[in-house]
Amino acid sequence: MAIRSLFSGNRKKKEDGQEKAFPEGLMTKCPECRHIQLTKELEKNHKVCTKCSHHFKMTAQERVDYFLDEGSFVSMDDHLQTSNPLNFPAYVEKISADQEKTGLNEAVLTGVGTLDGEEIVVAIMDSHFRMGSMGSVVGEKITRAVEKATELGVPFIIFTASGGARMQEGVLSLMQMAKTSVALKRHSDQGLLFISILTHPTTGGVSASFASVGDINIAEPQALIGFAGRRVIEETVREKLPNDFQTAEFLLEHGQLDAIFPRKDLRKQVSLLVKMHTKGGVQHV
């Protein structure tokens, strides 16, 4: 018997046992537990891992579809366009690429809709667009959305997901922290509700401004929420930080959040909060 024939059978078995390639997009691997699941099942579960309950990032449109009453959402200010005030190299091209990729004009989607029949104004940040960073258009859209809620006399709800202020716009991006906060103060002065829902990740200037000043601050499980990065803080204070530092659970334990709701319960719980703070209230809780 030829030596080659001793190995040919093993090779054939190996070739027969090779994993078949799945069509692109059919399966999704969880980054937390490595479980591979059907993308359709993941989406049906509101992009929460069916094994470990890891919350995947959602697009702004996915949150609209999940959170608001079907067909009720009317978007605002889709015409606003970012300029390049500092002539930052390739900035305009990157914005255009993200617009094409996401279908959004900027890193936040704003508009009016209803939640179980109650009219609200929402702003939903999308980390797929420039990592949800806040530039002048993002700040302007959020400010206009708050002002619309104040004008209508309805609650304002924001879903935050951001890497912070957008460096390509310099001080103009930092100004949005103050501008949005002033609009929210006027909204509050009218006795109107503001609910901030912090999702993964909410950091930098966004966490230091409108994201943290809600009448009710809620987060999704395990969301990263903080200002500066862990390494920067550890080098500054010269101490080792807890493993769960800057997680939603850590912030809840230390009084910086009012509640953490898993995504499957979020709509119901926020709807209840809105009804409790709306004229007429709820009959039975």
Swiss-Prot record:
Residues 1-20 are annotated as: Disordered. The keyword Lipid metabolism applies. Residues 26-285 form the CoA carboxyltransferase N-terminal domain. InterPro entries: AcCoA_carboxyl_beta, Acetyl_CoA_COase_Trfase_b_su, ClpP/crotonase-like_dom_sf, COA_CT_N, Znf-ACC. Binds 1 zinc ion per subunit. A zinc finger (C4-type) spans 30-52. Its EC number is 2.1.3.15. Its cofactor is Zn(2+). Component of the acetyl coenzyme A carboxylase (ACC) complex. Biotin carboxylase (BC) catalyzes the carboxylation of biotin on its carrier protein (BCCP) and then the CO(2) group is transferred by the transcarboxylase to acetyl-CoA to form malonyl-CoA. This is Acetyl-coenzyme A carboxylase carboxyl transferase subunit beta 2. The lineage of its organism: Bacteria, Bacillati, Bacillota, Bacilli, Bacillales.
